[in-house]
Each structure stands twice: as structure tokens, then as C-alpha cells.
Amino acid sequence: MAYVIIDTSSILFGIRYNKDVFKSVNEKYPQLKQLISYGVMSELEKMASNKGTKANEARTALKILRHKNLKVDNKSEYVDSWILDTASKNANSLVITNDTKLFKNLKSKGIETKKLSKSGELR
């Protein structure tokens, strides 16, 4: 099955700029199931336990994720490794990430990868 795999960085980027990464994905790729890893939830929970702007963004992200109909993969490995492995094993999947290092790594392996822009577009 093909998925749109969404990374923590894109979720937080969307919140920071009042853009809904899930809506953008749905509009551009309605035929693909959205997928995140348990590790994304763990990263957000860890961030949310702190104070400051990033913690507030993480809390907002968690509230949003709890109301979305997303598939959550229960593997608890490091998120970037999970994304690379999952995208490699599922043909025609693509990844949404605003993490520059991960973006370049995925692209170098031939995996379709997009970033969420400040305007809410996937590029």
C-alpha cells in the first residue's frame, strides 16, 4: 500500500505558520493513506512536557493528531530510520518532511519527498 508519511518537523512547521499539513496532503494526495510513526507521537509528547513556544506547538500538534483519522505505526524505532525504512518498503509512498537533512537523505535514495511551505503548499 502507498502512504504519505508525515514527519514531526512538517507537523510543527504547519502549526507555527497556521497551515494544516494534513489538509494539504488530503487535497494533493486524496488517494493515499496518511501515516505517522509512534515515534512522532513520542517526540511530540517529550517536547510538550517542556515550556516555551515549541512546547506549546507540540501540545497543539498532539491535540490535532488525536482527532485525525491517521494510521499510526507502532514501531518505536528512531523516527528518521523508520521513515526511511517504511518509505523504501512501500512502493509509491512519499514523505512530507521539513527536516533538511532527512529531506536530502530521502531524495538521494530516490524516495519522493516534499516540504510544507509557509503558504501551505507541498513542494
Question: Can you name each region flagged by the protein language model?
Answer:
Residues 40-123:
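Nuclease catalytic cores that cleave nucleic-acid phosphodiester bonds
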Residues 1-67:
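Domain-level signal for Mg2+-assisted phosphodiester chemistry and nucleotide/NA-binding surfaces
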